């Protein structure tokens, strides 16, 4: 084992010198710094500066570090526990349990967090639809089992609530394994998620990995890889179908940009690291389904200042099979989930995958909403009276469709006071077909808000009429 000394500390970046004759650690090796009080700090090698000096990124706070402290090369990358022992537990970036439920057994297998993506020959593609029970998603931007899904939205439009509802709907009905990775998000939300999963009984089938907002950038940059390594093991060694939730993939990029300048790299567009696309590719290419098992990943993507052209969300787009775009204007109208039905996309919205009827209903819904959007300028300037009878019918139906795309969530019951609704795909397609056929044109618009199936609209309309 090579030993060296700390020679420079700048925030989360630590330079370590190894004397001549010592083996200089490889890139991505984990080094242990002895802080002298029985504590050690793990750092990861990022750059070799020459003359036996390496530049590393700390995985925890560098408070109390001093020049001259002893550093030991572990001879390998960060290794985290994998397999059955991880289920029902909460880990940090180093794979250390943080839930006060005891240590992980020493004989538990451990894997390096840096691994190659599966080879082209091993990949498998699937066209099986993953039912979410959320009308707007199942109808207009359906998810594929074994696919990659992105939830895009600015601050406070409901990404985390949507991910929690998807966990509630899919993980509870899905008998496989779930891995939840919290990357640079609120610790409070992570704590709530843990307790909700424990209460609902899903926790025993779930591994949780957190590197939250208060952690140094090194931890936020690597915690997604820790969660992914656990998911990969369930897929490859046990042939399981795994659900991988990442909240929030933008923070992975953000952490990389925080340390990029300290590592001496020249920033690229908007101050991001020049290696943005490479880092994203290395992570995303590992999240895939193979012939052994599948990984279905659902990733929340923060959109800075609601700007979809920002390099971070724009780079993520290229890797996804389905995108669910959350729109602030819809939250202002009280439509939740605030999914934009025209901007959200899915490669699975194809008659050969979802069936002819589903495809026709979905495209007709989009056509109606698009026509309504085009007519809004005329309505705002000249009013409804200037529209033809056919256009008035289109507008009235579009408004009913827009409100009917909302629905109450189980995870938001405590805030709304309304029981959450799970709507099967067949029910969703039938309901929208009947709205398009004009069967409910006589019911008031407000009856379509925050309900599940179409029968609830009829009941609500009767109640409103009394």
Swiss-Prot record:
Cross-referenced InterPro entries: AAA+_ATPase, ATP-synt_VA_C, ATP_synth_F1_bsu, ATPase_a/bsu_AS, ATPase_alpha/beta_chains, ATPase_F1/V1/A1_a/bsu_N, ATPase_F1/V1/A1_a/bsu_N_sf, ATPase_F1/V1/A1_a/bsu_nucl-bd
Subcellular location: Cell membrane
Family named by the database record: Belongs to the ATPase alpha/beta chains family.
Assembly description: F-type ATPases have 2 components, CF(1) - the catalytic core - and CF(0) - the membrane proton channel. CF(1) has five subunits: alpha(3), beta(3), gamma(1), delta(1), epsilon(1). CF(0) has three main subunits: a(1), b(2) and c(9-12). The alpha and beta chains form an alternating ring which encloses part of the gamma chain. CF(1) is attached to CF(0) by a central stalk formed by the gamma and epsilon chains, while a peripheral stalk is formed by the delta and b chains.
Physiological role: Produces ATP from ADP in the presence of a proton gradient across the membrane. The catalytic sites are hosted primarily by the beta subunits.
HAMAP family from the UniProt entry: ATP_synth_beta_bact
UniProt-listed NCBIfam families: atpD
Descriptive protein name: ATP synthase subunit beta
Lineage start: Bacteria, Bacillati, Bacillota, Bacilli, Lactobacillales
Gene giving rise to this polypeptide: atpD
């Amino acid at each position: 084992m090579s030993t060296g000394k700390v020679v420079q500390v700048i925030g989360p970046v630590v330079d370590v010198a190894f004397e001549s004759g010592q083996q200089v650690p490889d890139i991505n090796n984990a080094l242990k710094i002895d802080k002298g009080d029985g504590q050690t700090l793990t750092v990861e090698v990022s750059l070799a500066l020459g003359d036996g000096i390496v530049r590393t990124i700390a995985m925890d706070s560098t408070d109390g570090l001093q020049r001259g402290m002893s550093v030991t090369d572990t001879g390998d990358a960060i290794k985290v526990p994998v397999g059955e022992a991880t289920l029902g537990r909460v880990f940090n970036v180093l794979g250390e349990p943080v839930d006060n439920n005891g240590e992980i057994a020493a004989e538990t297998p451990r894997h390096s967090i840096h691994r190659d993506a599966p080879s082209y020959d091993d990949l498998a593609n699937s066209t099986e639809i993953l039912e979410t029970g959320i009308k707007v998603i199942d109808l207009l931007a359906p998810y594929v089992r074994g696919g990659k899904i992105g939830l895009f939205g600015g601050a406070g439009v409901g990404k985390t609530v949507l991910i929690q509802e998807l966990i509630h709907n899919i993980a509870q009905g899905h008998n496989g394994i779930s891995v939840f990775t919290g990357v640079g998000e609120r610790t409070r939300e992570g704590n709530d998620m843990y307790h909700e999963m424990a209460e609902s009984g899903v926790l025993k089938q779930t591994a949780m990995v957190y590197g939250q907002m208060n952690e140094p950038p090194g931890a936020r940059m690597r915690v997604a890889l820790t969660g992914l390594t656990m998911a990969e093991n369930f897929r490859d060694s046990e042939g399981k179908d795994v659900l991988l939730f990442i909240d929030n993939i933008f923070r992975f990029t953000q952490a990389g940009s925080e340390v990029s300048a300290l590592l001496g790299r020249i920033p690229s567009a908007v101050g991001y690291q020049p290696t943005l696309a490479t880092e994203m590719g290395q992570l995303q290419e590992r999240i895939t389904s193979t012939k052994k098992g599948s990984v279905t990943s659902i990733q929340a993507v923060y959109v800075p200042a609601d700007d979809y052209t920002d390099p971070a969300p724009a780079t993520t787009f290229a890797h996804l099979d389905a995108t669910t775009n959350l729109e602030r204007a819809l939250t202002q109208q009280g439509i939740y989930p605030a999914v934009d039905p025209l901007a959200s996309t899915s490669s699975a919205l194809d008659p050969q995958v979802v069936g002819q009827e589903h495809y026709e209903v979905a495209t007709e819904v989009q056509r109606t909403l698009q026509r309504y959007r085009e007519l809004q300028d005329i309505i705002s300037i000249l009013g409804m009276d200037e529209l033809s009878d056919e256009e008035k019918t289109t507008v009235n139906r579009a408004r009913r469709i827009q409100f009917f795309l909302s629905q109450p969530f189980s995870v938001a019951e405590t805030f709304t006071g309304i029981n959450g609704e799970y709507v099967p795909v067949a029910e969703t397609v039938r309901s929208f077909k009947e709205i398009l056929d004009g069967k409910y044109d006589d019911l008031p618009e407000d009856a379509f808000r925050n309900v599940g199936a179409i029968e609830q609209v009829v009941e609500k309309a009767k109640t409103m009429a009394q």
